[in-house]
């Protein structure tokens, strides 16, 4: 049994007289309630009295721990629920935490958790020219590893700066089976509200690099897609994105969008390129379909160029399958 949340785990450690000095919070904040991309300030946690150091604030490089924040730290513990997708930023935060651990010779304990997308590997492998906080390593979009396995890979592949090694300990999962579907004890972030959204996230997050909405600003985030520019005869699902707690500035806010509702299809639990290809085929605004963020999410310039050139889905998939074998 793993803790339901990092917050509850901190409270338990305090009651057991562990000397917890501070909390480092990734994107979405300590309790996972902040919207994506939000700059979060440092604060004092009301319940524990501990300082929360935001690793997603405007005054620091996302994910990085400053050395002075580790002056009184003997051991670092990394306990975050990941979803097993390259552009979900917790593995980038893990990379920087491991660098801070190695740089300051502080042991790091990673609490392993189930990966809800561990049952397969798929998608284009990142080219380092497109390296960013939404993709730091040469892995496919869906990489099939738990967070503990991923930490071990970072160390073993020499991906840390100057080939440093973190003094790493993994608290492993007992009796874990990646073929079994686990209901996560907590929501990973505000816009992944259920298992279907988590399974569709690898496919639909690519729309963040286009003029198509993936449902932010609705109650069906990453379970629907659409835009005002899609052919409404072929895309008969309607929705209007509105500002909410999970999305302060949703794409196409207050505009009627035409698209597809994927929430009821139980078979959609793997990466599927057809949603993106169909949306591009159905758009009335091909010239502005892609934005500059797309290549960062895809991890390569090739995917966009293949779509623009009219390459078939089968041939596009074949082009990245070679690197996965």
Descriptions of predicted regions:
Residues 1-7, 11:
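Single conserved hydrophobic/aromatic residue that forms the stacking wall/gate
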Residues 10, 208-218, 225-230:
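Active-site loops and adjacent core secondary-structure elements that bind or stabilize anionic groups
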Residues 19-27, 111:
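Short internal beta-strands
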Residues 32-36, 109-131:
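Glycine-rich, charge-decorated loop segments at or immediately adjacent to ligand/cofactor-binding or catalytic sites
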Residues 41-72:
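Glycine-rich oxoanion-binding loops at beta->alpha junctions
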Residues 82-94:
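Glycine/threonine-rich flexible loop motifs
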Residues 131-203:
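Conserved anion/nucleotide-ligand pocket segment
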Residues 221, 225-321:
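Conserved functional hotspot residues or short segments at active or partner-binding sites
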């Amino acid at each position: 049994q793993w803790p339901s949340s990092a917050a509850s785990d901190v409270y338990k450690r305090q009651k057991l007289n562990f000397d917890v000095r501070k909390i480092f919070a990734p994107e979405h904040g300590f309790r996972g309630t902040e919207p994506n991309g939000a700059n979060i300030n440092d604060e004092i946690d009301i319940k524990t009295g501990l300082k929360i150091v935001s690793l997603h604030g405007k005054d620091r490089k996302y994910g990085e721990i400053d050395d002075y924040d580790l002056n009184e730290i003997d051991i670092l513990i990394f306990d975050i629920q990941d979803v097993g997708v390259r552009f979900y930023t917790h593995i980038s935060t893990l990379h920087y935490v491991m660098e801070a651990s190695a740089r300051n010779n502080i042991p790091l304990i990673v609490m392993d958790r189930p990966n809800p997308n561990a049952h397969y590997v798929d998608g284009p492998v990142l080219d380092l020219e497109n390296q960013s906080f939404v993709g730091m390593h040469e892995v496919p979009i869906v990489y099939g590893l738990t967070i503990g396995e991923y930490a071990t890979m970072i160390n073993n592949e020499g991906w840390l700066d100057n080939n440093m090694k973190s003094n790493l300990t993994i608290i492993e999962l007992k009796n874990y089976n990646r073929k079994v579907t686990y209901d996560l004890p907590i929501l990973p972030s505000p816009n992944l509200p259920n298992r279907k959204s988590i399974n569709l996230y690898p496919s639909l997050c690519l729309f963040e690099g286009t003029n198509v909405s993936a449902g932010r600003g609705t109650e069906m985030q990453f379970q629907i897609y659409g835009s005002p520019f899609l052919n409404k005869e072929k895309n008969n699902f309607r929705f209007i994105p509105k500002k909410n707690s999970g999305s302060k500035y949703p794409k196409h806010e207050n505009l009627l969008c035409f698209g597809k509702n994927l929430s009821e299809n139980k078979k959609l639990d793997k990466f599927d390129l057809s949603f993106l290809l169909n949306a591009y085929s159905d758009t009335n605004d091909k010239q502005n379909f892609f934005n500059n963020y797309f290549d960062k999410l895809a991890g390569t310039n090739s995917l966009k160029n293949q779509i623009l050139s009219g390459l078939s889905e089968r041939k596009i998939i074949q082009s990245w399958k070679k690197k996965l074998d």
